[in-house]
Amino acid sequence: MPDLNHIIERMRANADAITALARDLSDAQSRWKPTADAWSLLEVVNHLHDEEREDFRTRVDYVLHRPGEQAPPIDPEGWVSARAYNQRDPRASLDAFLRERAASLEWLRGLHDPDWDAEYRAPWGVLRAGDLLVAWLAHDHLHVRQLNELHYAYLAQQAAPYSVEYAGEW
C-alpha cells in the first residue's frame, strides 16, 4: 500500500522543484528546443498541467470512485502541438500547473481509506489505483529530470565557444 502522506509531500516538493526550474527564465530559454522534435521547458510545463488535470487525478478518481466507467481519452503527445504549448505565456502556464497541483494535493488529502488495489482493466492489462498514484509521482521525477536536462543543454549551447565539460560528465 503506498504511503499517501509521503507521496503528497513529494508531489508538493516536486511542484517547488518545477517552479525553481521554470520560473523567471527568458522567453527564449522557455521556448528553446535542443532539437526540432524535442520539447521546450514551456512545453514540459504545459504537459505537466494537462497531465495533472486530465490524466492522473482523473484516472485515479475513476478507478477509485467510478468502477467500470471509462475515463476520457487522452493524447499527451498530440496535445503539445494541437494545444500550441510553445506559444503560451510561460508565467501563466506555470501558474496554471501550480493551481492544478494544489487542487490535486487537496483532493488526495481528502481521500478516506482509498482502495489502492481497485482495478481498471485497460486494453493492455490491469491497472490499479495504487499503480496510478505511484506513477503520478514517478511522472514528476521524469519531468524534473527533463527540465534539468534542458537547462544543461541550453547552457552548453549558449556558452559556446566555452565548454561545460569541466563540470563533469552529464
Model-found features: residue ranges?
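Acidic/histidine-rich alpha-helical segments that form the ligand environment
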Residues: 14, 78-117, 131-136, 146
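Solvent-exposed interaction patches of small proteins and small membrane subunits
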Residues: 2, 6-9, 32-33, 65, ...
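Generic structural signal for well-ordered, non-transmembrane alpha-helical segments
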Residues: 12, 16, 50, 54, ...
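Surface-exposed helix-capping loop/turn segments at secondary-structure junctions
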Residues: 23-30, 109-117, 153-156
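Short, contiguous alpha-helical
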Residues: 31-76, 119-170
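Alpha-helical bundle segments that constitute or directly flank the non-heme di-iron/ferroxidase center
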Residues: 1-29, 51-62
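Short amphipathic alpha-helical segments at helix-loop
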Residues: 3, 41, 82-89, 124-128
